[in-house]
Amino acid sequence: FQSKDFTKHVPDKNYYDFIIIDEFHHAAAPSYQLLLSYYEPKILLGMTATPERMDGKSVLPYFDGRIAVEIRLPDAIDRKLLCPFQYFGVNDTTDLSQIRWTRGGYDTSELSNVYSMEQYGAKKRAEWVLEETDRYVTDWNDVTGLGFCVSKAHAKFMSDYFNDHDVPSMYLTSDTAYADRKSAKQKLVSGQVKFIFVVDLYNEGVDIKSVNTILFLRPTESLTIFLQQLGRGLRLSEGKECLTVLDFIGQANNCLLYTSPSPRDRQ
């Protein structure tokens, strides 16, 4: 279904009895719209861990306004389907109040400059991130971590800084070759590196069960993205007691408002 011409390969609208779509929160995307409006299966099963959309659009109309089965994050943790986590909001003195606020979020180029260029104090912030990580992790030998960054420059800067301070790290971006991404994952799991810093990767579709430390190194206005990134560390793994989350909270723009009703609340 990644092909725009998939309907030409299977033109019969009733050909499929059962269609399963993962990450169904993407249903508003044009490619999904084409699929959903074209085929008429007897059963349509949509699955997502993040049904809430920041644009307010609901996925429920595809299912007659009803959710067949639902389990929320706290319930999944209580039932030991997911790993418990400890979440620390770490004070970040980086002043974001003067960064332009456009289209419901911070200007990413300005954020990138603040987080990766020395004239804006990027090295001081990276030093603070490393100090706080050292304060909260129990044993560096056991760390399997991901750091979510705002830009390619930011991811590289953080990886370089950690490496320069004896914390083996790598960074991955959309420019990274598939073979290198696979190798990075193997190195993280084996303990050869302690952190992988990423931008626009690992939000979904990646399963690294041993991840036990997550660093939120940028503001995230999207609840969906926040939960997806948090979810990278919630998989159960042998010997993993809990996930440690460090959220570096800067002096933010006062336009931020984290409110999002659940799909049931929207009914």
Spell out what each predicted region is.
Residues G233-L256:
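Conserved segment of the helicase C-terminal RecA-like domain
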Residues F1-Y15, Q33:
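Conserved helix/coil segment N-terminal to the catalytic DExD/H
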Residues R72-T138:
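Conserved interdomain linker/interface between the two RecA-like ATPase lobes of SF2 helicase motors
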Residues Y258-D265:
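Conserved small/polar residues in nucleotide/adenosyl-binding loops
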Residues S222-S237:
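Conserved SF2 helicase motif VI
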Residues M170, T176-V198:
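Conserved helicase ATPase core of P-loop NTP-dependent helicases/translocases
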Residues A29-L82:
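Post-DEXD/H (motif II) to motif III coupling segment of the RecA-like Helicase ATP-binding lobe
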